[in-house]
Amino acid sequence: MTSSLALVLVFGGAAVCAELALRGGYRERSNQDDPEYLELAHYATSTWSAQQPGKTHFDTVVEVLKVETQTVAGTNYRLTLKVAESTCELTSTYNKDTCQANANAAQRTCTTVIYRNLQGEKSISSFECAAA
């Protein structure tokens, strides 16, 4: 009886520790084509590119490569994207359906973190790119 209780305590404690390790960390999602993630990807890419000095065209999302989420007081979305300069000038309004990647534009791999609070308001926490 004592050894059974000890085993329950050991395995129960291990399960609690594993659960605590997951809390607060990012969890990978398998559905990169989910409309919510695509909307966030386009929001971050178009907003970020519009703020870059010297740019004349919006960047657009070519592909969502990876999605991770983290529950905080709201949700952090860490997205890894393939982006390229679009055919839409910054003087126009960005539209994900009409702002297609420029055929001659180099593609870059970017990672962005978007925070969405409990009221649904979103903001870009970071956006970093490297050559693809």
Swiss-Prot record:
Q: In which tissues is it expressed?
A: Detected in salivary gland and midgut.
Annotated Gene Ontology cellular components are:
cytoplasm; extracellular space; vesicle
Predominant location: secreted
A matching Pfam family = Cystatin
InterPro entries noted in UniProt: Cystatin_dom, Cystatin_sf, Prot_inh_cystat_CS
Q: Where is this site: Reactive site?
A: G24
- Where is the stretch described as Required for interaction with mouse ANXA2? 87-131
Q: Do you know what upregulates this one? A: Strongly up-regulated in salivary gland during feeding.
In terms of superkingdom, the source organism counts as Eukaryota
Kindly list the GO molecular function terms attached to this UniProt entry: cysteine-type endopeptidase inhibitor activity
Compartments annotated for it: namely: Secreted
UniProt domain Cystatin: residue ranges: 28-117
Which residue pairs form cystines in this protein? C88-C99, C110-C129
Q: Where is the signal peptide?
A: 1-18
Effect of inactivating the gene: Combined, RNAi-mediated down-regulation of salivary cystatin-L and salivary cystatin-L2 in salivary glands strongly impairs the tick's ability to feed on hosts. About 40% of the ticks cannot feed and die. The remainder show much reduced blood intake, appear unhealthy and display strongly reduced egg laying. RNAi-treated ticks show an impaired ability to suppress the host's immune response to tick salivary proteins.
Self-association state and partner proteins as the record states = Monomer. Interacts (via loop 2) with mouse ANXA2; the interaction results in reduced activation of mouse NLRC4 inflammasome formation upon Anaplasma phagocytophilum infection.
UniProt cross-references to PANTHER family, sorted A to Z: CYSTATIN (PTHR46186:SF2)
Remaining remarks: Decreases symptoms in mouse model of mannan-induced psoriasis-like inflammation by modulating immune responses. Vaccination of guinea pigs against the protein increases tick rejection during feeding, prolongs feeding times, reduces blood intake and induces visible inflammation at the bite site.
Report the function annotation for this chain: Contributes to the suppression of the host's immune response to tick salivary proteins and is important for successful feeding on hosts. Inhibitor of cysteine proteinases. Inhibits host immune responses, probably via its inhibition of host cathepsins. Inhibits host papain (in vitro). Inhibits host cathepsin L (CTSL) (in vitro). Inhibits host cathepsin L2 (CTSV) (in vitro). Attenuates IFN-beta (IFNB1)-triggered JAK/STAT signaling pathway in mouse dendritic cells.
Membership in a protein family? Belongs to the cystatin family.
User: What protein name applies here?
Assistant: Salivary cystatin-L2
State the species of origin: Ixodes scapularis
